[in-house]
């Protein structure tokens, strides 16, 4: 299932995420099978780009890689880009981090 949310592109690896702000802590949640997205919980509020910055910082720490928001900068549904990892690397890391796996 997770492989459907991680896609290869010319620029790198794309991950479809669903963001919840104002969380108790920053964490990767579970797979939202209905929306086909990985849930990310962030402590920051979505004000003046604070949540987006927190998402980037949080995911950089997990993937040890550059992270860019590819689409959805003003939405809770986003696609992030990891330009310097393989799909297998990303899937392996996510499987270790996701709560429901």
From Swiss-Prot:
Family per record: Belongs to the UPF0235 family.
SMART domains: DUF167
GO (cellular component) term, any one: cytoplasm
Highest taxon of source: Archaea
Protein name according to UniProt: UPF0235 protein MMP1055
């Amino acid at each position: 299932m997770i492989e459907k949310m991680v896609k290869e592109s010319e620029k790198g690896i794309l991950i479809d995420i669903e963001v919840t702000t104002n969380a108790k802590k920053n964490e990767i949640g579970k797979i939202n099978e209905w929306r086909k997205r990985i849930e990310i919980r962030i402590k920051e509020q979505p004000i003046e780009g604070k949540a987006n910055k927190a998402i980037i910082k949080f995911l950089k720490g997990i993937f040890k890689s550059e992270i860019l928001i590819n689409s959805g900068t003003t939405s809770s549904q986003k696609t992030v880009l990891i330009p310097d990892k393989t799909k297998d690397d990303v899937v392996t890391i996510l499987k270790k981090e996701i709560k429901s796996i």
